[in-house]
């Protein structure tokens, strides 16, 4: 299976999981050039959540949780800023950055995976 197909499958799995947790999915693969994309954007009650999905089929060398680098965090923050510029109706919402880490068949939802100063 190609890397993109694997990523899409993991993101779909994450969306289904978040739906069971009562989150409303607003966007999937939001493109925020030149920074990249945000895997999932959702509402958790009155909080706007930007979610990165990481998948590892083999955890011998690293867990999915370990794959969210500082550089990726900065890209997510910049991408979130672009999303808010394009969607001013969410400007006054609290924002949060979460990680959905999928290791083999386990899903780990890390709320507030990193903070923004």
From Swiss-Prot:
Q: Which residues form a coiled coil?
A: none
The region annotated as signal peptide is none
Q: Which Pfam families match?
A: UPF0102
InterPro entries attached to this UniProt entry: Restrct_endonuc-II-like, tRNA_endonuc-like_dom_sf, UPF0102_YraN-like
Annotated GO MF terms = nucleic acid binding
Give the source's domain of life in one word: Bacteria
Q: Which HAMAP family match?
A: UPF0102
Q: Which NCBIfam families does the UniProt entry name for this protein?
A: PRK12497.1-3, PRK14682.1, YraN family protein
Q: Which family does it belong to?
A: Belongs to the UPF0102 family.
Protein name (database record): UPF0102 protein FTW_1281
């Amino acid at each position: 299976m190609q890397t993109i197909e694997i990523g899409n499958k993991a993101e779909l799995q994450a969306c289904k999981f978040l739906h069971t947790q009562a989150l409303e999915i607003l966007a999937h693969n939001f493109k925020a050039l030149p920074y990249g994309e945000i895997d999932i954007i959702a509402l958790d009650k009155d909080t706007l959540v930007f979610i990165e999905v990481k998948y590892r089929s083999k955890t011998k060398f690293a867990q999915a949780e370990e794959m969210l680098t500082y550089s990726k965090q900065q890209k997510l923050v910049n991408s979130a800023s672009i999303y808010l510029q394009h969607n001013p109706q969410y400007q006054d919402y609290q924002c949060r950055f979460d990680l959905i880490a999928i290791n083999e068949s386990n899903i780990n939802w890390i709320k507030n995976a990193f903070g923004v100063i």
